[in-house]
Curated annotation (Swiss-Prot):
EC id: 4.2.1.-
A GO BP entry: isoprenoid biosynthetic process
Cited function: Displays glyoxalase activity, catalyzing the conversion of glyoxal to glycolate. However, this apparent glyoxalase activity may reflect a protein deglycase activity, which could be the primary function of this protein like other DJ-1 superfamily members such as PARK7, YajL, YhbO and HchA. Is not able to use methylglyoxal as substrate.
Organism ancestry: Bacteria, Pseudomonadati, Pseudomonadota, Gammaproteobacteria, Enterobacterales
Active site: 135 (nucleophile)
Keywords: Lyase
GO molecular function: lyase activity
Protein name as annotated: Glyoxalase ElbB
Recorded superkingdom: Bacteria
GO cellular component term of the entry, any: cytosol
Record's catalysed reaction(s): glyoxal + H2O = glycolate + H(+)
Family (UniProt): Belongs to the peptidase C56 family.
Subunit structure: Homodimer.
Length: 217
C-alpha cells in the first residue's frame, strides 16, 4: 500500500488548512487504496481568525493540535516526516499554507517556506517521488526549488504575476483540472482559489490525487 504524506497547516480556511480540501484529499487517497500519513508543524499559528466574523482573535493556537481535529488525532509533527517512508507528498491549501507553512500572505515574492517542509519536499523530489500542491499552496514551490516549475493557482492574475516574478511558469487552469510538470513530477490544481462549492473543489482534487498516485508507480 502506497503511503502518501499529507501536510496540514491548522484547521480552517482563514488561519489553517482549508478543511474541505484536506478532507477531500484524505478521501481520494483512501478510495484509491493508498494510505494517508498526516503531518503538521508543531508551532504556534501566525494568527487565529474567528471563522464566523472573519475577525482576528487574541488567543493563540498550535498548528499541529489544530490540524489533529481534521485527522481524528492521527497526525505527527512535521519534523518526524521521512521522505524514505513516503511514496508521494500532497499539500492542501487554506491561508495556513501562506501563513504557517510559509509567509507568502505577508511577504509575497519575498517569502520563505517552513524549513521542515522545504527539506522534506526537496528530499522527495531528489528521490523521484511526486508532489501535489493545491489552492494557494503552489505559491511555495518557487521558494522550495531553485529551478523553473510549471504550476497553477487557477486564474487569479495578481497572484499569477507574483509567482512569475518568483520564477515559476504559471499556467491558467479551471477548477476541475490539473497542471502537471511532468519533468519534476509536480501536480497542482486551483481548488478553492476558484471553487464555488465543495463539489467543484473535489473535481480537481480527485484528479490531482489520481495523477500523483500514477506518478508514484
Amino acid at each position: 500500500m502506497k503511503k502518501i504524506g499529507v501536510i496540514l497547516s491548522g484547521c480552517g480556511v482563514y488561519d489553517g488548512s482549508e478543511i474541505h480540501e484536506a478532507v477531500l484529499t484524505l478521501l481520494a487517497i483512501s478510495r484509491s487504496g493508498a494510505q494517508a500519513v498526516c503531518f503538521a508543524p508543531d508551532k504556534q499559528q501566525v494568527d487565529v481568525i474567528n471563522h464566523l466574523t472573519g475577525e482576528a482573535m487574541t488567543e493563540t493556537r498550535n498548528v499541529l493540535i489544530e490540524a489533529a481535529r481534521i485527522t481524528r488525532g492521527e497526525i505527527r509533527p512535521l519534523a518526524q516526516a521521512d521522505a524514505a517512508e513516503l511514496d508521494a507528498l500532497i499539500v492542501p491549501g487554506g491561508f495556513g499554507a501562506a501563513k504557517n507553512l510559509s509567509n507568502f500572505a505577508s511577504l509575497g515574492s519575498e517569502c520563505t517556506v517552513d524549513r521542515e517542509l522545504k527539506a522534506l519536499a526537496q528530499a522527495m523530489h531528489q528521490a523521484g517521488k511526486p508532489l501535489g500542491f493545491m489552492c494557494i499552496a503552489p505559491a511555495m514551490l518557487p521558494k522550495i526549488f531553485d529551478f523553473p516549475l510549471r504550476l497553477t493557482i487557477g486564474t487569479d492574475i495578481d497572484t499569477a504575476e507574483v509567482l512569475e516574478e518568483m520564477g515559476a511558469e504559471h499556467v491558467p487552469c479551471p477548477v476541475d483540472d490539473i497542471v502537471v510538470d511532468e519533468d519534476n513530477k509536480i501536480v497542482t490544481t486551483p481548488a478553492y482559489m476558484l471553487a464555488q462549492n465543495i463539489a467543484e473543489a473535489a473535481s480537481g482534487i480527485d484528479k490531482l490525487v489520481s495523477r500523483v498516485l500514477v506518478l508514484a508507480e
